[in-house]
From Swiss-Prot:
Name of this protein: Fructose dehydrogenase large subunit
Biotechnology: This enzyme is commonly used in a number of research projects to examine the electrochemical properties of enzyme-catalyzed electrode reactions, named bioelectrocatalysis. Available as a commercial product from Sigma Aldrich (catalog number F4892).
Organism: Gluconobacter japonicus
EC number: 1.1.5.14
Annotated FAD binding sites: 14-30
Taxonomic lineage from the root: Bacteria, Pseudomonadati, Pseudomonadota, Alphaproteobacteria, Acetobacterales
Gene Ontology MF annotations: flavin adenine dinucleotide binding; fructose 5-dehydrogenase activity
């Protein structure tokens, strides 16, 4: 073990979007901050080269993990082939095969940048519809922090347009949405005849130069990497924090936490890649890892005072794991659509995000994937044995006519959807892999039956042929639950400020604290919650 003990006012574990935004806000307000991440620093140009040199078959299957090599001391998920980092069991194990990245910047290196606000009713699902759980706060309490997050991240949205249902706003989006490309425009016109409202997706992507980053130029490569940096990434906040004095330590795998007689956290220990142990002390500690790694660490760090895990007196750490179970459809449209103009996700059908039906079945988001079809078209045309002019013509035809649509569903928190430490798999440092048991439940299955018909209606309206629909639920990497919030320490892990009930100086700035999944991407809500937690931390340390 190293003889040196590191120290700071605040130690943050996890340098993804939540941890980095939190670090920047705290250091900007005069606190000393140490920001740790299990993974390495990553270089954008190298990621681009990794993507360029990937096998075509990986690209056609939307392999977004391989450009980010997993390191032995901090493995993350990769399914090409499956590295068995995340073990998933249960009837819907396909629905929880999450894609995560470890490293400074986190998984926002490869996201679509969709930055939705949740609806007011998402915060009071149980009070309104009698199902699920309520958040420990209202939408109105989080609204100022939503705007703070939007400004930090540079979110563009449909200023001046009316969207139903929508989240009330006190201020306009920092930037106005880019215009649709041909594919989204055509899709919008067609589904409007079905009574569906296809509206612009708020995105953390620049429609004009913003905060030192360039305007999006439509590379359509947001996943796995924006080559020019127009799309927001948690690494930007990490760099800002570092310039103001925060210290970033990559390749730091936290494995233990010490507590005193009052059960306050007094120190944490981390391994470096050589398995040398290092100790860190602070006044306040924050775990800002993703919704898988946060409960995993809390369980791993069990000690004599907390034999079932840190912050786990309720036995809810690792329970209520959520995402947005998805179903997808692909087909060839009768008329050219030419997906690929602009970013990968420009629009979404919002009609089914809220309503009285939520007392019986899940709300949904239906969307059009604007990812260019040429890679998939090329692989399909080659599999048909075509050569020469016929091959070229078939690739062009499929690229023009290929359509991908999807339906994502909210899922209710269920304590049986649980993460535990694997007894069978360990990484190079001897740390157990996470293991999740997952069942989406009848609430989702009932909704999915309706969604499948809606997708079929869209395909029919577009003259679809070669229709393929996923027969199982797919993940969306919107990891929520696992350390759920609430007022009562007996049935929740954190309070409305993300402070753990068991440890007064430990906060969890992560999507794992979210009490309901809603229907849309969770990143903006995670960011807003983290920025709100920063105010609680600042107030604590100001009072001494």
């Amino acid at each position: 073990m190293s003889n040196e003990t590191l120290s700071a006012d605040v130690v943050i574990i996890g340098a993804g979007i939540c941890g980095s935004l939190l670090a920047h806000k705290l250091v900007r307000n005069g606190l000393s901050v140490l920001l740790l991440d299990a993974g390495p620093r990553r270089d954008r140009s190298q990621i681009v080269e990794n993507w360029r040199n990937m096998p075509p078959d990986n690209k056609s299957q939307y392999d977004y993990a391989t450009p980010y090599p997993s390191v032995p001391w901090a493995p993350h998920t990769n399914y090409f082939p499956d590295n068995n980092y995340l073990i998933v069991k249960g009837p819907d194990r396909t629905a929880y095969k999450q894609g995560i990245i470890k490293g400074v910047g986190g998984t926002t290196w490869h996201w679509a940048a969709s930055s939705w606000r949740y609806l007011p009713n998402d915060f009071k699902l149980h009070s309104t519809y009698g199902v699920g759980r309520d958040y420990a706060m209202s939408y109105d309490e989080l609204e100022p922090y939503y705007y703070e997050a939007e400004c930090e991240m540079g979110v563009m949205g449909p200023n001046g347009e009316e969207i139903t249902p929508s989240a009330p706003r006190q201020n306009p989006w920092p930037m106005t949405s880019m215009p649709y490309g041909y594919g989204d425009r055509t899709f919008t016109e067609i589904v409007s005849k079905l009574g569906f409202s296809n509206t612009p997706v708020p995105q953390a992507r620049n429609s004009r130069p913003y905060d030192g980053r360039p305007q999006c130029c439509g590379n359509n490569n947001c996943m796995p990497i924006c080559p020019i940096g127009a799309m927001y990434n948690g690494v930007y906040a990490a760099i800002k924090a570092e310039k103001l004095g925060a210290k970033i330590i990559p390749n730091a795998v936290v494995y233990a936490m010490e507590t005193d007689a009052k059960n306050r956290i007094t120190a944490i220990s981390f391994y470096d890649p050589d398995k040398q142990s290092h100790r860190v002390v602070a006044k306040t500690f924050v775990i800002a890892a993703n919704g898988i790694e946060t409960p995993k660490l809390l369980l791993l760090a069990a000690n004599d005072r907390n034999p079932h895990g840190i912050a786990n007196s309720s036995d809810l750490v690792g329970r209520n794991m959520m995402d947005h179970p998805g179903i997808g459809m692909s087909f060839q449209s009768a008329e050219p659509i030419w997906a690929g103009g602009g970013s990968v996700q420009m629009s979404s059908i919002t009609n089914f995000r809220d309503g009285d039906f939520r007392s019986e079945y899940a709300a949904t988001q239906i969307g059009y994937n604007n990812t260019a079809q040429n890679s998939r078209a090329g692989m399909k045309a080659l599999s048909m044995g075509l050569v020469g002019k016929k091959l070229d013509e078939e690739i062009r035809r499929r690229t023009a006519h290929g359509v991908d649509i999807y339906a994502n569903h909210e899922v209710l928190p269920d304590p049986n959807n649980r993460l535990v430490l694997s007894k069978d798999y360990k990484d190079a440092l001897g740390i157990p892999h996470p293991e999740v048991t997952y069942d989406v439940g009848e609430y989702v299955r009932k909704s999915a039956a309706i969604s499948r018909q809606r997708l079929m209606d869209i395909a029919k309206a577009m003259g679809g042929t070669e229709i393929e629909m996923t027969p199982y639920f797919t993940p969306n990497n919107h990891i929520t639950g696992g350390t759920i919030m609430g007022h009562d320490p007996r049935d929740s892990v954190v309070d409305k400020w993300l402070r753990t009930h068991d440890h007064s100086n430990l906060f969890l700035a992560t999507g794992a604290t979210m009490a309901a999944s809603g229907t849309v991407n969770s990143t903006l809500t995670m960011a807003a919650l983290s920025l709100r937690a920063a105010d609680a931390i600042l107030n604590d340390l100001k009072q001494g």
